[in-house]
């Protein structure tokens, strides 16, 4: 199953489109038979804009904020799910979506994204790498 990460309704209204959904639909058109688009995830509540949040704050912001819609739970159970996103920054959204899919019994969950932001190198990280 190709499972796009959910776009917040407010973001969809503001932009007028759903780029992650569009990406997943385009990907599904190029897949062999048996691989299906499954817009199975939804937000359970509003979340703060993630743009200025650090890794820990992003994870806390998203904790419990994504679930599998009832109508998709049977389909997801036991299935291999490919999460689709446009950009991965810290991985917090992918982690929360993975948690939601596994909670209803997804078989395997993997992630696919068009781009990823580079990790910020902090003095502590540099010191840790030098010590290794």
Language-model regions, residue ranges each:
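Active-site glycine-centered loops adjacent to acidic/histidine catalytic or metal-binding residues
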Residues: 86
